[in-house]
Amino acid sequence: MKKLFALILAALMVLGCVAVASAEQAQTLQLNWEEYAAEIEASEEAKAALSGDFVTMEEIALKIYIPAAFKQTELTDEDREAGYIAYFTMGEDKGVGIQYVDVGGMSLEEYAQRLTEEYGYECKDAVVNGLPALAYSFTENDRETSVLAFSTEKGYILEIAFAPTNDEGFAAVAAVLMASVQAAE
Protein backbone atom coordinates (compact mmCIF):
# COMPACT_ATOMS: atom_id res chain seq x y z
CA MET A 1 0.00 0.00 0.00
CA LYS A 2 2.84 2.41 0.79
CA LYS A 3 4.38 1.66 -2.62
CA LEU A 4 1.07 2.55 -4.24
CA PHE A 5 0.99 5.90 -2.48
CA ALA A 6 4.62 6.57 -3.36
CA LEU A 7 3.87 5.95 -7.03
CA ILE A 8 0.84 8.21 -6.97
CA LEU A 9 2.73 10.90 -5.12
CA ALA A 10 5.63 10.80 -7.56
CA ALA A 11 3.33 10.87 -10.57
CA LEU A 12 1.39 13.88 -9.29
CA MET A 13 4.16 15.85 -7.57
CA VAL A 14 4.94 18.03 -10.58
CA LEU A 15 1.31 18.82 -11.28
CA GLY A 16 0.64 19.53 -7.62
CA CYS A 17 3.53 21.99 -7.44
CA VAL A 18 2.19 23.83 -10.49
CA ALA A 19 -1.33 23.98 -8.99
CA VAL A 20 -0.03 25.32 -5.67
CA ALA A 21 2.15 27.92 -7.37
CA SER A 22 -0.71 29.16 -9.56
CA ALA A 23 -3.08 29.18 -6.57
CA GLU A 24 -0.68 31.35 -4.59
CA GLN A 25 -0.40 33.78 -7.48
CA ALA A 26 -4.14 34.03 -8.05
CA GLN A 27 -5.20 33.77 -4.37
CA THR A 28 -7.93 31.41 -5.59
CA LEU A 29 -7.34 27.69 -5.69
CA GLN A 30 -8.03 26.50 -9.24
CA LEU A 31 -8.65 22.78 -9.73
CA ASN A 32 -9.26 21.36 -13.19
CA TRP A 33 -9.92 17.67 -13.78
CA GLU A 34 -8.57 17.78 -17.34
CA GLU A 35 -5.10 18.70 -16.07
CA TYR A 36 -5.04 15.90 -13.51
CA ALA A 37 -6.56 13.37 -15.93
CA ALA A 38 -3.86 14.16 -18.50
CA GLU A 39 -1.12 13.70 -15.89
CA ILE A 40 -2.61 10.38 -14.77
CA GLU A 41 -2.99 9.19 -18.35
CA ALA A 42 0.69 9.94 -18.99
CA SER A 43 1.83 7.58 -16.22
CA GLU A 44 1.21 3.84 -16.28
CA GLU A 45 1.85 3.69 -12.53
CA ALA A 46 -0.70 6.41 -11.79
CA LYS A 47 -3.26 4.81 -14.13
CA ALA A 48 -2.89 1.49 -12.34
CA ALA A 49 -2.95 3.01 -8.87
CA LEU A 50 -5.89 5.32 -9.53
CA SER A 51 -8.02 3.00 -11.63
CA GLY A 52 -11.66 3.68 -10.79
CA ASP A 53 -14.86 5.36 -11.91
CA PHE A 54 -16.86 8.52 -11.45
CA VAL A 55 -19.65 8.21 -8.89
CA THR A 56 -22.66 10.46 -9.43
CA MET A 57 -24.57 11.75 -6.44
CA GLU A 58 -28.03 12.24 -7.91
CA GLU A 59 -29.32 14.27 -4.97
CA ILE A 60 -26.58 16.87 -5.42
CA ALA A 61 -26.06 16.73 -9.22
CA LEU A 62 -22.30 16.32 -8.77
CA LYS A 63 -19.90 13.55 -9.55
CA ILE A 64 -16.53 12.62 -8.07
CA TYR A 65 -13.88 10.18 -9.22
CA ILE A 66 -13.43 7.30 -6.77
CA PRO A 67 -10.50 4.88 -7.24
CA ALA A 68 -11.31 1.16 -7.02
CA ALA A 69 -9.23 0.92 -3.82
CA PHE A 70 -12.03 2.83 -2.03
CA LYS A 71 -15.13 1.04 -0.81
CA GLN A 72 -18.47 2.72 -0.24
CA THR A 73 -19.57 2.43 3.38
CA GLU A 74 -23.22 1.88 4.17
CA LEU A 75 -24.62 4.86 6.03
CA THR A 76 -26.51 4.48 9.29
CA ASP A 77 -29.71 6.33 10.10
CA GLU A 78 -27.64 8.60 12.36
CA ASP A 79 -25.28 9.35 9.46
CA ARG A 80 -28.21 10.30 7.23
CA GLU A 81 -29.71 12.46 9.99
CA ALA A 82 -26.34 14.23 10.27
CA GLY A 83 -26.55 15.07 6.55
CA TYR A 84 -24.18 12.47 5.14
CA ILE A 85 -24.84 11.47 1.54
CA ALA A 86 -21.93 9.08 1.02
CA TYR A 87 -18.78 7.81 2.67
CA PHE A 88 -15.91 6.00 0.97
CA THR A 89 -13.05 4.32 2.82
CA MET A 90 -9.65 2.97 1.90
CA GLY A 91 -8.22 0.71 4.52
CA GLU A 92 -9.14 1.38 8.10
CA ASP A 93 -8.17 5.02 8.46
CA LYS A 94 -8.53 6.85 5.13
CA GLY A 95 -11.75 8.21 3.77
CA VAL A 96 -13.90 10.65 1.87
CA GLY A 97 -17.14 11.91 3.41
CA ILE A 98 -19.85 13.84 1.56
CA GLN A 99 -22.25 15.77 3.77
CA TYR A 100 -24.92 18.47 3.62
CA VAL A 101 -24.54 21.15 6.28
CA ASP A 102 -27.59 23.26 7.14
CA VAL A 103 -26.24 26.79 7.45
CA GLY A 104 -29.52 28.63 7.19
CA GLY A 105 -28.92 29.85 3.65
CA MET A 106 -25.42 31.29 4.17
CA SER A 107 -23.32 32.10 1.11
CA LEU A 108 -19.85 30.58 0.77
CA GLU A 109 -18.39 33.93 1.83
CA GLU A 110 -20.54 34.00 4.98
CA TYR A 111 -19.69 30.36 5.71
CA ALA A 112 -15.97 31.12 5.38
CA GLN A 113 -16.35 34.00 7.80
CA ARG A 114 -18.14 31.73 10.28
CA LEU A 115 -15.46 29.03 10.01
CA THR A 116 -12.75 31.63 10.57
CA GLU A 117 -14.45 33.38 13.49
CA GLU A 118 -15.80 30.33 15.32
CA TYR A 119 -13.09 27.75 14.64
CA GLY A 120 -10.05 29.74 13.51
CA TYR A 121 -9.91 27.94 10.16
CA GLU A 122 -8.05 29.54 7.29
CA CYS A 123 -10.36 29.40 4.27
CA LYS A 124 -9.44 29.87 0.61
CA ASP A 125 -11.68 30.64 -2.29
CA ALA A 126 -11.60 27.89 -4.89
CA VAL A 127 -12.95 27.09 -8.32
CA VAL A 128 -13.27 23.38 -9.04
CA ASN A 129 -14.05 22.61 -12.67
CA GLY A 130 -15.89 25.91 -12.95
CA LEU A 131 -17.81 25.49 -9.67
CA PRO A 132 -17.26 28.14 -6.96
CA ALA A 133 -16.06 26.51 -3.76
CA LEU A 134 -14.35 27.08 -0.45
CA ALA A 135 -11.31 25.08 0.69
CA TYR A 136 -10.16 24.67 4.28
CA SER A 137 -8.37 22.20 6.53
CA PHE A 138 -8.40 21.41 10.21
CA THR A 139 -6.47 19.07 12.49
CA GLU A 140 -8.02 16.97 15.22
CA ASN A 141 -6.14 14.27 17.15
CA ASP A 142 -3.08 14.67 14.87
CA ARG A 143 -5.27 13.91 11.85
CA GLU A 144 -5.62 16.60 9.19
CA THR A 145 -8.86 16.81 7.23
CA SER A 146 -9.14 18.86 4.04
CA VAL A 147 -12.56 20.04 2.93
CA LEU A 148 -14.11 21.43 -0.22
CA ALA A 149 -17.41 23.24 0.40
CA PHE A 150 -19.99 24.15 -2.24
CA SER A 151 -23.15 26.22 -1.89
CA THR A 152 -26.38 24.55 -3.03
CA GLU A 153 -29.52 26.04 -4.54
CA LYS A 154 -31.47 24.92 -1.46
CA GLY A 155 -29.34 27.05 0.88
CA TYR A 156 -27.17 24.25 2.25
CA ILE A 157 -23.42 23.83 2.11
CA LEU A 158 -22.20 20.58 0.60
CA GLU A 159 -18.89 19.51 2.15
CA ILE A 160 -16.59 16.88 0.73
CA ALA A 161 -14.00 15.98 3.36
CA PHE A 162 -10.77 14.02 2.81
CA ALA A 163 -8.73 12.53 5.66
CA PRO A 164 -5.97 12.17 6.66
CA THR A 165 -4.31 14.70 4.38
CA ASN A 166 -1.25 14.92 6.63
CA ASP A 167 -0.38 11.50 5.15
CA GLU A 168 1.59 12.51 2.02
CA GLY A 169 0.45 9.53 -0.02
CA PHE A 170 -3.20 10.05 0.81
CA ALA A 171 -2.84 13.81 0.26
CA ALA A 172 -1.82 13.07 -3.34
CA VAL A 173 -4.87 10.86 -3.80
CA ALA A 174 -7.10 13.49 -2.16
CA ALA A 175 -5.77 16.15 -4.56
CA VAL A 176 -6.86 14.01 -7.51
CA LEU A 177 -10.29 13.40 -6.00
CA MET A 178 -10.74 17.09 -5.19
CA ALA A 179 -9.91 18.01 -8.77
CA SER A 180 -12.44 15.48 -10.06
CA VAL A 181 -15.52 17.08 -8.45
CA GLN A 182 -17.74 18.40 -11.22
CA ALA A 183 -21.34 18.90 -12.28
CA ALA A 184 -23.09 15.66 -13.21
CA GLU A 185 -24.05 15.46 -16.86
Listing of model-derived features with the role each one plays in the protein:
Residues 87-110:
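A short acidic-to-branched-hydrophobic micro-motif
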Residues 108-110, 146, 169-173:
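A short, polar/proline- and glycine-enriched secondary-structure boundary/capping micro-motif
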Residues 49-55, 81-86, 128-137:
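Short, hydrophobic/aromatic-rich segments at coil-to-beta transitions
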Residues 56, 97-104, 123, 137, ...:
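Second-shell loop/turn segments in exported
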Residues 57-61, 91-96, 140-143, 155:
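Glycine-centered tight beta-turn/hairpin loop motif at sheet-sheet or coil-to-beta transitions
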Residues 6-8, 15-81, 154, 162-185:
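N-terminal targeting sequences that direct proteins away from the cytosol to non-cytosolic compartments
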Residues 112-157:
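Signature of long, low-cysteine stretches enriched in small and polar/charged residues
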Residues 1-2:
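N-terminal hydrophobic targeting signals that begin at the initiator methionine
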